[in-house]
Amino acid sequence: MVSVNELGLDLFEELVENADLFNVAYHELDNGSRVVDCGVSVPGGYGAGDYFTRICMGGLGDIAFRQGMVGQFPMTFIDVNTDFPAISCLGSQKAGWTVKHDNFFAMGSGPARALSLQPKHTFEVIGYEDESDAAVICLEADRLPSGAVMEMIAEKCKVDVANVCALVAPTSSLVGSIQVAGRCVETAVYKLNELGFDTTKIIAAAGTAPIPPVRGAKLAMGVTNDATIYHGQINLTMNAPEIVDYLEKIPSCSSNGYGKPFNDIFKEAGYDFYKIDKSLFSPAEVIINEVSTGKVYQVGKVDTAVTLKSFGLA
């Protein structure tokens, strides 16, 4: 079985060795744990975003950047693909670990989740659990973790604190925008898992989404989510004829909340995240190739108007 932490650690070491080339900052804490700042006090960039996203996927995904169009506007897109959709997306990339300690708060994702089993049910349904002496975690936060935070992560992962490695980027940073858009495939796999579909039947997955502009901390969560909700396009290859029973529920347009920028929806919900229809967190359009029957299905559509409004271009 592949180890997402061992693969992620190899990429982490590459990033550390070339920190200056990627506009990131490397820190070794007093307890021996290691942190790479990808956007808190440094600019980061596309190179750092590439590493952050691939590490977040446990080294089981590839990404590329390209120029595309959102309506009449040229935008940079991120293309993502993986041959291990369930493990890379649900077992690693999913932001399934809320890391809290004193005044520190972060959404945790990446390989370390496969050691801490956060949340446990996810790993039960995909039948995966990592074994590694090192833990690599990706933190979506606006400050760097302290030694005490890294100690807590080590305890949850059952590893020595000196073997804990963290990458950190705020949502409202270039790397933050890149890595959230880089979750476009994960949202499709996540949605199918939430619907009760066996995601281990997905053979391969690929997708694309525009990288949203950095518009400040207040708008960051909404803008980054909208990139996938309204313009994420995904291709799934699977051996699962039963997918026909799930098709109409997959795309974001199946949600009651669909049709407005996320920040507008959030405001209408009284800024209570839990009042938002969970089914909204899905890609705009999905193409599925079911190989046992040879059938191809298409559901959903991109919404250029809402995307541009969210991005500040309309």
From Swiss-Prot:
Keyword Cytoplasm assigned: yes
The entry lists its GO molecular-function terms as: methenyltetrahydromethanopterin cyclohydrolase activity
Question: Where does it reside?
Answer: Cytoplasm
| Recorded metabolic or biological pathway in which this protein acts | One-carbon metabolism; methanogenesis from CO(2); 5,10-methenyl-5,6,7,8-tetrahydromethanopterin from CO(2): step 3/3
Task: State any GO BP term from the record.
Answer: one-carbon metabolic process
Cite the Pfam families for this sequence: MCH
Q: Which reaction does it catalyse?
A: 5,10-methenyl-5,6,7,8-tetrahydromethanopterin + H2O = N(5)-formyl-5,6,7,8-tetrahydromethanopterin + H(+)
Sorted alphabetically, which InterPro entries does this protein's record hold? METHMP_CycHdrlase
What keywords sit in the KW lines? Cytoplasm, Hydrolase, Methanogenesis, One-carbon metabolism
| Entry keyword annotation includes Cytoplasm | yes
The superkingdom of the source organism is Archaea
Q: Please name the top-level EC class of this enzyme.
A: hydrolase
Cellular component per GO, a single term: cytoplasm
- Which NCBIfam families does the UniProt entry name for this protein? one_C_mch
Similarity-based family: Belongs to the MCH family.
Q: Could you tell me what this protein does?
A: Catalyzes the reversible interconversion of 5-formyl-H(4)MPT to methenyl-H(4)MPT(+).
The protein depicted here goes by the name Methenyltetrahydromethanopterin cyclohydrolase
